């Protein structure tokens, strides 16, 4: 089923530059290539939904960054890593078949609202005030 307002949506791919990919029904995935940090932040501020799949269990920051910018983010589980509880903007899938991703993306897009209320989700990640609290303990032990 196609999104009723699909003609209003722009579909972008950030990262490695690639040719545009025709998606059907007059829509294409447009590559914007690698973005500066400022361009990346601006793009996230203007984005409602995104897909960022992990290909290793190592830290994968794009889905985290997208979700704290209030982007409804689809990602995947990988081995023992599951971001589903990171915040309410994260959708973490065990099954990343194209049909399953499309189904979840359609659900997200059907819930689209022009104004997305900002909620400071996962403030420990966002504010990052006490990252190295353990250093004082190490100093005391070694002291």
Which positions does each model-derived feature cover?
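Nucleotide-sugar-dependent
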Residues: 53-63, 68, 82-84
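Short hydrophobic beta-strand element within catalytic cores of glycosyltransferases
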Residues: 71-76
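Conserved catalytic-core segment of nucleotide-activated headgroup transferases in glycan assembly
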Residues: 1-26
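Acidic donor-binding loop of glycosyltransferase active sites
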Residues: 42-58
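Short acidic alpha-helix that forms the nucleotide-activated donor recognition element
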Residues: 36-47, 68
